């Protein structure tokens, strides 16, 4: 409840921020179509390329003015990308913070009400006396803040090894990689008799066959847990079983204290605690990785565009749509999430200091590069897609859903780009677009951006598709409503351990000492529920309506509007399929013992919502 009180207090402060120093500034409450809306001018009614604009001098003067008023400021929350700055940049950020706060207000109120009811019920029950009691915290509660409820199967199957392993291929697919038979060494040893009994094979044989996978959180051993909280720094080995054709866990190594290695053949409580310890590390990774891989990347690419393209440019208009409220998140996060004593310090095993270190360490090489993080390129680089050194994954929910969604996004972007540029030659002559590419590679310091000059329309399609993927899909797989419904559901996914990592096996009679108590549990659920935005379904701000912007469509040719109609129709079909998922005769959905809907286009926002 302390978290909610702090959130409400900061929310009130942000809500009262002025939109501008000038009372006459035109700053719309809805999604801005272009930067003209930000500087007090009505948005253009038609978008044009610079070499087709009859008012080219005015256009150039506006860009010059914008470059003086939108600047690169210091990074926020670790050393990642520059944050928007300057007189106009500050105004844009304040506007976004105000819009964000208005959206947050009903969520905060709903969470506060839901939390009080959940805490009351568990206290009436007599507290958490066993693991099944954690269901009481959820069942019949959180209907206002999390109306879709908890993912089916998360309670009934929380001890399942298949559930644990398949979460690596759905709720957080960004830490897993296949071990290459030659380029990668085995990360740690596992007793050969245990491996044989579990897999029917040997560790070297699995490695050689490309059937061995690693999720490595050993970097977290450098982080200092907060007082009264504890964490391991787990590495987990997974394997493809050629007998049952499933992706399963093999071993978990803690890398702290006695550095124990756990396997599914250990005592049930020992093994379940090992999975909980891994999930503490994984929940921290997912939440902090999303910050560096989506917010920091999308912002800097867009910021470079703001400084180089006219408000009349159709590409900037599209980017503006995608970046709705984008410049609210890092400053608000800096003030209420990652500040000393803030929400992260209250709910996570590690403090805000670790968050900043994570962002600083991961952004330059893992989370920040653009091209190497294109959807399929990223999966191929980790051996999860089209691997040449091992068999295909029998089920890969993240890819299965993501591939369909990104195909629909790409199809719209292709239509959009072709409607603007009739040929590659036309694109090559667009000096504003080329200035954007040069700026991104230069002053903006975007990592691994397509090189200048941009010569092909397909390369622009790649950039814009990736931006839409980051803002409308990738972000929500790790954040938004996903943690409260799946990846942060108790008792399997606590934000911290509350007892030291065991120094030996066979001493865990109950997991309760390591898990959050009643109050801490309600605090965790409340904290994660604050990220959810259920109201976007009613006001058509879901992924399905990503490009359904009146100003964007009115300012472009009819072909773009037609492409948007097809986009909404296709996303509607995907949404219907995902929302209607059920368990098959084996009690599985997409090969998992829980139903995952984290990419439902009819539920997730089209923008960086939190």
Curated annotation (Swiss-Prot):
Q: Which residues form the signal peptide?
A: 1-16
Determine the domain of life of the protein's source: Eukaryota
* Species per Swiss-Prot/TrEMBL record: Fusarium oxysporum (strain Fo5176)
Pfam families tied to this protein: Lipoxygenase
**How and how many cofactors are bound, per the record note?**
Three His residues, the carboxyl oxygen of the C-terminal Ile or Val residue, and a fifth residue, usually Asn, ligate the metal, which binds water to form a catalytic base Mn(2+)OH(2) for hydrogen abstraction.
Subcellular location(s) per record: Secreted
Q: Where do the Lipoxygenase domain residues begin and end?
A: 47-610
Keyword presence, Manganese = yes
Summary of the function given for this chain in its UniProt record: Lipoxygenase that metabolizes linoleic and alpha-linolenic acids to 9-, 11- and 13-hydroperoxy fatty acids. Oxidizes linoleic acid to mainly 11R-, 13S- and racemic 9-HPODE, and alpha-linolenic acid to 11-HPOTrE.
Q: What is the lineage of its organism?
A: Eukaryota, Fungi, Dikarya, Ascomycota, Pezizomycotina
Top-level EC class as recorded in UniProt = oxidoreductase
**What is one term from the GO cellular component aspect held by the record?**
extracellular region
Q: Which GO terms describe its biological process?
A: linoleic acid metabolic process; lipid oxidation
Identify the glycosylated residues: 157, 259, 386, 540
Q: Which cofactor does it need?
A: Mn(2+)
At which positions is Mn(2+) bound? 290, 295, 475, 479, 610
Q: What is this protein called?
A: Manganese lipoxygenase
Report which reactions are catalysed by this protein.
(9Z,12Z)-octadecadienoate + O2 = (11S)-hydroperoxy-(9Z,12Z)-octadecadienoate; (9Z,12Z)-octadecadienoate + O2 = (11R)-hydroperoxy-(9Z,12Z)-octadecadienoate; (9Z,12Z)-octadecadienoate + O2 = (13S)-hydroperoxy-(9Z,11E)-octadecadienoate; (9Z,12Z,15Z)-octadecatrienoate + O2 = (11S)-hydroperoxy-(9Z,12Z,15Z)-octadecatrienoate
- Say which family it is in: Belongs to the lipoxygenase family. Manganese lipoxygenase subfamily.
């Amino acid at each position: 409840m302390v978290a909610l009180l702090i959130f409400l207090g900061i929310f009130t402060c942000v809500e009262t921020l002025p939109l501008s120093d000038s009372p006459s500034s035109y700053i719309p409450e809805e999604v801005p179509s272009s930067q003209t809306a930000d500087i007090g001018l009505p948005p253009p009614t038609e978008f044009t390329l610079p070499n087709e604009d009859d008012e080219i001098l005015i256009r150039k003067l506006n860009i010059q003015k914008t470059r003086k008023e939108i600047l690169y400021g210091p990074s926020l929350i670790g050393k990642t990308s520059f944050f928007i700055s300057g007189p106009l940049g500050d105004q844009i950020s304040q506007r976004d913070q105000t819009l964000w706060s208005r959206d947050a207000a009903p969520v905060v109120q709903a969470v506060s009400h839901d939390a009080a009811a959940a805490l009351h019920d568990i206290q009436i029950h007599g507290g958490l006396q066993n693991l099944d009691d954690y269901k009481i915290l959820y069942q019949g509660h959180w209907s206002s803040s999390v109306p879709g409820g908890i993912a089916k199967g998360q309670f009934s199957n929380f001890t399942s090894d298949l559930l644990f392993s398949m979460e690596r291929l759905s709720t957080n697919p960004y830490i897993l990689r296949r071990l290459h038979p030659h380029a990668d060494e085995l990360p740690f040893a596992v007793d050969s008799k245990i491996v044989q009994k579990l897999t029917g094979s040997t560790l070297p044989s699995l490695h050689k066959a490309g059937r061995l996978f690693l999720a490595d959180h050993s970097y977290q051993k450098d982080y200092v847990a907060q007082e009264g909280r504890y964490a391991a720094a787990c590495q987990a080995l997974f394997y493809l079983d050629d007998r049952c054709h499933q992706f399963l866990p093999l071993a978990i190594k803690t890398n702290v204290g006695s550095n124990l290695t756990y396997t599914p053949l250990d005592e049930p409580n020992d093994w379940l605690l090992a999975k909980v310890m891994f999930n503490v590390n994984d929940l921290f990774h997912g939440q902090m990785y999303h910050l560096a891989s989506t917010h920091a990347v999308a912002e800097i690419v867009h910021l470079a565009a703001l400084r180089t393209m006219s408000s009349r440019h159709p590409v900037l208009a599209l980017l503006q749509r995608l970046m709705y409220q984008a410049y609210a998140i890092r400053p608000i996060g800096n003030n209420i999430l990652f500040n000393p004593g803030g929400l992260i310090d209250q709910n996570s095993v590690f403090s805000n200091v670790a968050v900043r270190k994570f962002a600083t360490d991961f952004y330059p090489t893992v989370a920040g590069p653009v091209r190497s993080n294109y959807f399929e390129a990223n999966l191929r680089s980790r051996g999860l897609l089209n691997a040449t050194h091992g068999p295909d994954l029998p089920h890969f929910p993240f890819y299965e859903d993501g591939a369909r969604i990104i195909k629909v996004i790409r199809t719209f972007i292709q239509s959009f780009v072709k409607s603007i540029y009739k040929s590659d030659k036309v694109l090559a002559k667009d000096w504003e677009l080329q200035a954007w590419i040069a700026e991104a590679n230069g002053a903006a310091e975007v990592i691994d951006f397509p090189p200048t000059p941009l010569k092909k329309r397909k390369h622009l399609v790649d950039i814009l598709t990736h931006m839409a993927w980051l803002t409308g899909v990738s972000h929500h797989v790790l954040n938004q409503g996903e943690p409260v419904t799946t990846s942060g559901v108790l008792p399997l996914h606590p934000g911290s351990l509350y007892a030291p990592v065991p120094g030996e096996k066979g001493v865990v009679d109950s997991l309760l000492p390591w898990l959050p108590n009643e109050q801490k549990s309600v605090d965790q659920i409340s904290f994660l529920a604050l990220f959810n935005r259920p109201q976007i379904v009613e006001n058509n701000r879901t992924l399905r309506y990503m490009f359904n912007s009146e100003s964007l469509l009115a300012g472009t040719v009819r072909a773009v509007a037609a492409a948007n109609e097809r986009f909404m129709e296709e996303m509607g079909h995907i949404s219907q399929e995902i929302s209607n998922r059920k368990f098959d005769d084996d009690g599985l959905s997409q090969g998992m013992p829980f139903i995952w809907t984290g990419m439902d286009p009819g539920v997730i926002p089209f923008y960086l919502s939190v």
